[in-house]
A protein has these predicted regions:
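Conserved catalytic core of the tyrosine transesterase superfamily
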Residues: 1-196
């Protein structure tokens, strides 16, 4: 798994004023990847109607065709609103991908490879080390878990069927899990009246 980026590095990547409609799109994609922890494939398959901007949520079809609803942060919502203003300049009404949230410069649904290449370009322009879309997902998971300590919520947001996947993903160690267990499970607590 890729390393999680620290918050300062994420900020250096995302805090820029886009120059032109392609950079407006790229910023919206990067903000969404980090804000919601989406998989690259999930971003590629998003349609406009999958985002509810007022409610700040996104409906995602994940692995195994499972649907989930994930929150979207304010900065990502603003970047998406900015993109939607420019999106119509690329939209091709004759294309089967006319409902796609993110379009390439030919008006078709953007590919995973295009997103990877555009993210590499954003990093190069800012003098940042190579950052890939999965690193943004990994950073999302790590930062939310560090702040909340809620492994189950992170599991839901990431769309993991098995919590063990989330544990590996966020590099939780057994010692941390043991502390949570010891403090939360009634039969694990020391000094209860049932102890002998």
């Amino acid at each position: 798994l890729p390393k999680a980026m620290d918050a300062d590095l994420v900020q250096r990547l995302l805090d820029f004023k886009p120059n032109g409609l392609i950079e407006v799109r790229d910023k919206a994609i990067a903000e969404l990847l980090y804000s919601s922890g989406l998989r690259l494939s999930e971003v590629c398959t998003l349609d406009v109607q999958d985002l509810e901007l007022k409610e700040r949520v996104c409906r995602v079809t994940g692995k195994g065709n499972k649907m989930r609803v994930v929150p979207v942060g304010k900065k990502a919502i603003q970047a998406i609103r900015d993109w939607l203003i420019h999106r119509k300049e690329l939209k091709n009404s004759k294309s089967s991908s006319s409902e796609a949230m993110f379009l390439n410069n030919k008006g078709k649904r953007i590919s995973a490879r295009s997103i990877q290449l555009r993210l590499e370009k954003l990093c190069a322009q800012r003098g940042l080390p190579g950052i890939n879309p999965h690193m943004l997902r990994h950073s999302f998971a790590s930062h939310v878990l560090e702040s909340s300590g809620d492994l189950r919520a992170v599991q839901e947001m990431l769309g993991h069927a098995d919590i063990a996947t989330t544990q590996i993903y966020t590099k939780l160690d057994f010692q941390h899990l043991s502390k949570v267990y010891d403090s939360a499970h009634p039969r694990a607590r020391k000094g209860t009246k049932n102890d002998n």
